[in-house]
């Protein structure tokens, strides 16, 4: 069978780009290495263009081990946009924080490669390889500020708990293989349709939920998030909050809506309970936080709960809702964390009280932070409102209690988001000196703000693309 390399141009381009960035970093003089950030950015933009051009290019490789469909391409585009915005927002922060910038940028690229492999994984081996490439790369990024104890502590916590979750996930995959006799996700679906469920299969599914629950920071597998988010470099935190979740939800949908769709009634309640706990605990624990990165960490736990609502239905509408909301979530989250990086770079603090009078010191940053926080709260007419509408609509008939809980928790989130807004807009600044934003960070802020507003007012094109991607789901 002839191998069609055209189907993996995104993966090949990312591998070459990551390798080239690293090798060039070793060859060029240290004073010239800052330009490698621009090189990585241009390369990622090129890869994004290639991926968009190949939107209609679909196929199956390696007898079903690698699936290239519009569903996978959608998540690849999402992960690439995340990487581009993170790199763009990293220039000033990374130049100040670390010396070997080329290692940072090449690791971001290889992290993205792991994510896109996960999006196309059609079997357990490919899934695990992509997951581990992403996880190991994130370990390097989280501990990148090795001269700071907090960053090293975050890296140590992440590698230990990530290793544990990977072990649980791998054991769950082995149990599913033992129950079905295949590692191909499509074949798993057919085996379940023919033979039904077994206790061994159910245990395997539960372990998969636990392993992937760590990656998306779902309760009760969320305990690592606040410490790691706080200790990691802020651009890495934003990438961890959006890229890791996007790739993990791509896998979750493949496995549960595709592979385990035949036993949906046996795992729906489990996922619904985890979604409810994530919304509840994430929002409630965010209220007393005084560190903005920890507050956003708990907020991201709640956001994972909202996205899991779409997984509960596991229908085409649910898949569309997950994809739509994940896309919106990228812009709001990266926009907020970019502001955090800008303020931290100037004040060396992540405390909410140090955002006092930000509207006077950095008007654009304060405005973008407000818009992103309101979007995450689901305030119309911003994008987050539309995304939550699509998600909650999928469970109205069978799980109305999730809709009520989601609406209540969204109102709770308004409290702690507006608390930050009041500090920025009402309180007087401790210092009058303006905060320098920088050209690259300004571009990131403008992109995230404009996308959050436009996708809320005019969501039709994105909804149509998400619908096309959901319909292309190859696992029948």
From Swiss-Prot:
Family: Belongs to the complex I subunit 2 family.
GO MF annotations in UniProt: NADH dehydrogenase (ubiquinone) activity; NADH:ubiquinone reductase (non-electrogenic) activity; quinone binding
UniProt protein name: NADH-quinone oxidoreductase subunit N
Enzyme class: translocase
Membrane topology, record value: Multi-pass membrane protein
Enzyme Commission no: 7.1.1.-
Organism: Desulforamulus reducens (strain ATCC BAA-1160 / DSM 100696 / MI-1) (Desulfotomaculum reducens)
PANTHER family: NADH DEHYDROGENASE
């Amino acid at each position: 069978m002839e191998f069609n390399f055209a189907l993996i141009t995104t993966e090949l381009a990312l591998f070459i780009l990551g390798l080239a960035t690293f090798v060039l970093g070793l060859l060029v003089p240290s004073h010239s290495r800052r330009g490698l950030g621009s090189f990585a950015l241009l390369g990622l933009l090129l890869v994004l263009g290639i991926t968009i051009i190949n939107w209609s290019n679909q196929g199956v490789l390696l007898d079903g081990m690698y699936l290239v469909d519009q569903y996978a391409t959608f998540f690849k585009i999402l992960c690439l946009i995340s990487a581009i915005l993170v790199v763009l927002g990293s220039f000033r922060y990374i130049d100040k924080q670390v010396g070997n910038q080329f290692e940072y940028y090449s690791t971001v690229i290889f992290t993205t490669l792991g994510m896109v492999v996960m999006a196309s994984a059609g079997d357990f081996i490919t899934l695990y390889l992509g997951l581990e490439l992403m996880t190991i790369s994130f370990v390097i990024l989280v501990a990148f500020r090795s001269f700071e104890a907090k960053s090293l502590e975050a890296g140590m916590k992440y590698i230990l708990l990530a290793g544990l979750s990977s072990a649980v996930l791998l054991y769950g995959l082995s149990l599913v293989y033992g129950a079905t006799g295949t590692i191909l996700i499509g074949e798993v679906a057919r085996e379940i349709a023919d033979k039904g469920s077994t206790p061994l299969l159910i245990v395997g599914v539960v372990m998969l939920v636990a392993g992937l629950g760590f990656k998306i920071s779902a309760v009760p597998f969320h305990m690592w998030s606040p410490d790691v988010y706080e200790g990691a470099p802020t651009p890495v935190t934003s990438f961890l909050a959006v890229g890791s979740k996007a790739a993990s939800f791509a896998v979750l949908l493949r496995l549960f809506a595709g592979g385990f769709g035949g036993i949906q009634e046996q795992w729906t309640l489990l996922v619904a309970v985890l979604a409810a706990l994530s919304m509840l605990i994430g929002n409630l624990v965010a209220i007393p936080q005084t560190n903005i990165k920890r507050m956003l960490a708990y907020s991201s736990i709640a956001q994972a709960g909202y996205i899991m609502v779409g997984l509960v239905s596991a229908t085409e509408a649910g898949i569309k809702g997950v994809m739509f909301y994940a896309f919106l979530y990228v812009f709001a989250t990266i926009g907020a964390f970019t502001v955090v990086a800008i303020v931290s770079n100037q004040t060396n603090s992540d405390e909410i009280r140090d955002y006092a009078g930000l509207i006077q010191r950095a008007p654009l940053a304060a405005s973008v932070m407000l818009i992103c926080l309101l979007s995450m709260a689901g305030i119309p007419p911003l994008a987050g409102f539309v995304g939550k509408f699509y998600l909650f609509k999928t469970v109205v008939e069978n799980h109305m209690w999730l809709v009520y809980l989601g609406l209540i928790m969204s109102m709770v989130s308004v409290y702690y988001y507006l608390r930050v807004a009041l500090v920025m807009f009402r309180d007087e600044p401790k210092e009058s000196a303006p905060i320098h934003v920088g050209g690259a960070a300004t571009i990131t802020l403008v992109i995230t703000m404009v996308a959050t507003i436009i996708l809320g007012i005019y969501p039709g094109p994105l909804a149509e693309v998400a619908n096309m991607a959901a319909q292309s789901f190859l696992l029948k």
